[in-house]
Amino acid sequence: MTMTANKNSSITHGAGGTKAPRGTLSRSQSVSPPPVLSPPRSPIYPLSDSETSACRYPSHSSSRVLLKDRHPPAPSPQNPQDPSPDTSPPTCPFKTASFGYLDRSPSACKRDAQKESVQGAAQDVAGVAACLPLAQSTPFPGPAAGPRGVLLTRTGTRAHSLGIREKISAWEGRREASPRMSMCGEKREGSGSEWAASEGCPSLGCPSVVPSPCSSEKTFDFKGLRRMSRTFSECSYPETEEEGEALPVRDSFYRLEKRLGRSEPSAFLRGHGSRKESSAVLSRIQKIEQVLKEQPGRGLPQLPSSCYSVDRGKRKTGTLGSLEEPAGGASVSAGSRAVGVAGVAGEAGPPPEREGSGSTKPGTPGNSPSSQRLPSKSSLDPAVNPVPKPKRTFEYEADKNPKSKPSNGLPPSPTPAAPPPLPSTPAPPVTRRPKKDMRGHRKSQSRKSFEFEDASSLQSLYPSSPTENGTENQPKFGSKSTLEENAYEDIVGDLPKENPYEDVDLKSRRAGRKSQQLSENSLDSLHRMWSPQDRKYNSPPTQLSLKPNSQSLRSGNWSERKSHRLPRLPKRHSHDDMLLLAQLSLPSSPSSLNEDSLSTTSELLSSRRARRIPKLVQRINSIYNAKRGKKRLKKLSMSSIETASLRDENSESESDSDDRFKAHTQRLVHIQSMLKRAPSYRTLELELLEWQERELFEYFVVVSLKKKPSRNTYLPEVSYQFPKLDRPTKQMREAEERLKAIPQFCFPDAKDWLPVSEYSSETFSFMLTGEDGSRRFGYCRRLLPSGKGPRLPEVYCVISRLGCFGLFSKVLDEVERRRGISAALVYPFMRSLMESPFPAPGKTIKVKTFLPGAGNEVLELRRPMDSRLEHVDFECLFTCLSVRQLIRIFASLLLERRVIFVADKLSTLSSCSHAVVALLYPFSWQHTFIPVLPASMIDIVCCPTPFLVGLLSSSLPKLKELPVEEALMVNLGSDRFIRQMDDEDTLLPRKLQAALEQALERKNELISQDSDSDSDDECNTLNGLVSEVFIRFFVETVGHYSLFLTQSEKGERAFQREAFRKSVASKSIRRFLEVFMESQMFAGFIQDRELRKCRAKGLFEQRVEQYLEELPDTEQSGMNKFLRGLGNKMKFLHKKN
């Protein structure tokens, strides 16, 4: 069999390599008279045109296909096959020779070298003898002789092995050759598969270094022998064809170099590692030989070139279409073997470059003849899929082309729209970047492991023996099969690194085989899509397309590979996963997301590791599950959604009366008519997008009470303002109008105040809603100014668009401290605060200030990730209201009705109003919200739009006189409704309402139960429990929203409303959603998700993911469905009668 192998990757003829003087080759050739060889036999496997031309004309770049990145070592364009008979064998030059080079040189070179190395060697061991004098003859004789090569038979191989050892020992002059050498001899004379398996083993770039005979500085590593031998023993035959010669060659060269280069001890520092592990290689080779003997019916192993040809029966490649193979030859197979299967025995790291030597990077477009031939051959011979297999080779730094970034040796596509063909078994694209030093260059060339050498072998699990071949598996990776089966699929466990193809430690992981980096486009898109906290779930990197419109997800062998995955996979996906689907160019129509392909889609996404759910949340979920049952969603296709008739609304088991249906219709009409009169809303997401580059707050004011001249009453006025509104612009005029209203909110009870001597400071807040629906928060601190005797309080108020009560409470603390020293110290502090940036959620900003007597200070202000419970006190809410009354108020707010709270104390109104709004999380109240409404502004309650306001009890008589439209008036002091609409108990789905009520009734019992860890402390409070109970309500009703967010070709996301509503199994929930989806709260929620740029996840998104994983993915059997439908029809007919 004719094989070409250049382990050291020297100069490629005609490929742009560095030219050395022409005399170098002639000095390094040995041309002794050839011994008589057995008659040449034609190869069993047909050689491709490229292989044939490579045998005959190795000097012509246009017809040369280099296998496994091996190139002719001659630096001269002179034909190495024309040695002069008069040339005598000189001493070894050791400049650019490659010690692992196996060329298809004519038999003259081989016979000369054979005679020179081993006098009187047997004729049938010419291949082995030819490998010995390589230090003196640069063109290394291959195992074949003759222009087409000789395939030596396996007959009599073992009979000659002992003689080979004796001759080698005599030639070395030291000691008998090791069993590895005899094994090498056997395999070299045997069939290709027998000498193949040992070739790739010593090519690992590991710390055990074996010197090259060609250069004392070129070293090669051997520490990965055990893993490599394990890989090749488990792989099928086509993988091990051309792997066999490097091992004996290097072993003999090791002894040769040690003998010839004793004056250069630096090359022999770590050369003993290979001998220690030779038994592992022998055992693997013997296994392969044994299999060949036991199963002669399987025939000889296939060429590696045919390993990845398309199997029409099983293998389907879903990238660029399948290729077809003509019956004639394997020319593209040879090219595929040259650039794809190539790196099995290549170097994991490059040796240092010697002066005057260089090599062209194998597989570099434009430099490698094989890469030049490949496109034309592929077009002529479309049957073979040229696999972009990762190469374990090296290159000289001087000849590196920094502009060319090949993917595993494949030539670049003519256009970006046509990426190279991809295999059924994925492999990472190789991006090689220039490095400054030797270590960086070695890292960039190193590969992680050999797990993707054969597609079929990946389906078999590797042996799990931890100490096989005398070495232990690295405990970090777990079992080898788990890593290799799932390396390109769902990364589920907690990996120490964020990317499985980055930052592999040279010593502890795969011994210096760092995985190749992704191509720059894929890597950038990957980093854009995944935030740092989400990268523990790694998307398959090779599934990211370089062009958005290209089909990038491979469908071949999915059913086979997914069987090795972890069993728990999410059945449906959150909104952020839908964003990833759009990035991966998956079809995003509702039909594709709701049909049976949904489960397949879940496997294409990164499977989510099951997060630990707090026990308190589990208890709440169990209450809902007991009330609701198991069925949540219906499996729908677009056709069933579009053709769903009105009869479907009455076909569920939950039969409602006609009166309830009429009430539902009236509510729907009412909310639609009322919202038409409401101002347009602006969601928080949209506001923050506009304001995140602006200041932290808009203005800071100090409000004081001024006595009216005619009466003995006081009016609130702004006594200090920062910044001053100097420019008379439209925005400033609007700000002035707001400033006129702010004193009323700072002192809603101004008429009741009298000067006092003592007063404890009080903190409260309010919200201003503009005509355009924009929100501004007012954070107030009421306190007594410094002085003696009775005096009136004043209020420090900060107006901001940022809803963070805790952050501004810290600001007000600093203001109060400075105001106590001197009012002049407040201005420089507020000025430095206004210059501070707008903080992102979870980020901290630092404000540098100066205080006399204290010096320079730094105030840290942190914006919480989730501020839903800031300034919220559910204890006060449950003190004032019973559970049933609270649920009625909650239902009225969900349908955006008018709600008025009445209480005696300002703090009670403020606390209950903020707490009720917090129950709506993740939704936000989009309409007028005034926790404490000043008596002078009570006319607001007559507006026809939704609102939530709080009134002091002193304003109640006036409230009853006003023509207030339909509204729910609640007396917080007596826990009763002053006015109601009498349908508050029927607004929510009855099963969910029962679960909500039960969970709140048992709140003390649920909190008191033991927690499993300290991390549940946040939940094991009243605030945490109440929030989780209402979050679960929304998860049950709208938790599947992310399944119906689709993305258009332009990247715009849209929500499928009808499909979302009709996918719910429960009719009562569908009716609730029909009304709730008309609200501006729901519209703002969906708009936030459509506009959201980042993948930040709050508590609601986490609970939604857990909920979607819980959903059953089964549907009722056909008979049960038929019987149930028949029963529903009978009920419907009975109603009509």
Curated annotation (Swiss-Prot):
Composition-biased stretches (Basic residues): 432-446, 562-573
Stretches assigned to the uDENN domain: 698-846
Residue span of region Disordered: 1-99, 293-573, 641-661
Biased amino acid composition, Pro residues: 32-43, 73-92, 409-431
Annotated spans, Interaction with ABL1: 401-447
cDENN domain ranges (all copies): 868-1001
Transmembrane segments: none
Polar residues bias (residue ranges): 1-12, 49-64, 456-481, 514-524, 539-558
Domain dDENN span(s) in chain numbering: 1003-1096
Tissue: Widely expressed with the exception of peripheral blood lymphocytes. Isoform 1 is expressed in several epithelial and fibroblast (including tumorigenic) but absent in lymphoid cell lines (at protein level). Isoform 3 is expressed in primary cell or weakly tumorigenic but not in tumorigenic cell lines (at protein level).
GO molecular-function terms, A-Z: guanyl-nucleotide exchange factor activity
UniProt keyword annotation of Phosphoprotein present: yes
GO annotation terms (biological process): positive regulation of ERK1 and ERK2 cascade
PANTHER family: DENN DOMAIN-CONTAINING PROTEIN 2, DENN DOMAIN-CONTAINING PROTEIN 2B
Description of how the protein assembles with itself and partners: Interacts with ITSN1 and GRB2. Isoform 1 interacts with the SH3 domain of ABL1.
Protein's recorded name: DENN domain-containing protein 2B
Annotated organism of origin: Homo sapiens
Source species taxonomy: Eukaryota, Metazoa, Chordata, Craniata, Vertebrata
This protein's encoding gene: DENND2B
